[in-house]
Amino acid sequence: MNLTPREKDKLLISLAAIVARNRLERGVRLNHPEAVALISDFVVEGAREGRSVADLMQAGAHVIRAEQCMEGVPEMLHSVQVEATFPDGTKLVTVHHPIR
C-alpha cells in the first residue's frame, strides 16, 4: 500500500484516537497527545460527514472534559488546529479552548 505523507498522518491520528477511546472506556485519563488525537479525529470525521467548519469548531470543544485528562493537560491545550477535507475542499479548523 502506497500512502502519501498526508494519508500517513491521518492514519496515525485515527489510530491514536482509537487508543484514546479505549483508554477512556477503561477509565484511564488521557495525556496531551491522546487528547489532541481524539479532538483531531472528531474534526476530520465530522468534515467527512459534511458538517460545517463553524459547527466543528464549536462541537470540538465538547469532545473531552477536563476530568477525563491527566493533571495539567487542559491548561496546556489552548487550541487544536486540524486540516480537514470537506466536500468543497481542504480547510483549517481551529478548536479554541478544546477541553473545558
UniProtKB/Swiss-Prot annotation:
UniProt keyword list: Cytoplasm, Hydrolase
The entry's cellular-component GO terms read: cytoplasm
Gene Ontology BP, a term = urea catabolic process
Main localisation: cytoplasm
Q: Does the keyword Cytoplasm apply?
A: yes
- State the EC number(s): 3.5.1.5
Q: Say yes or no: keyword Magnesium present.
A: no
Known catalytic reactions: urea + 2 H2O + H(+) = hydrogencarbonate + 2 NH4(+)
CDD domains given in the database record: Urease_gamma
Q: In which pathway does it act?
A: Nitrogen metabolism; urea degradation; CO(2) and NH(3) from urea (urease route): step 1/1
- HAMAP family referenced in this protein's UniProt entry, alphabetically: Urease_gamma (MF_00739)
Report the sequence similarity comment from the record: Belongs to the urease gamma subunit family.
Quaternary state and interactors: Heterotrimer of UreA (gamma), UreB (beta) and UreC (alpha) subunits. Three heterotrimers associate to form the active enzyme.
Task: Please identify the protein, giving its name as recorded.
Answer: Urease subunit gamma
**Source species of the chain:** Cereibacter sphaeroides (strain ATCC 17025 / ATH 2.4.3) (Rhodobacter sphaeroides)
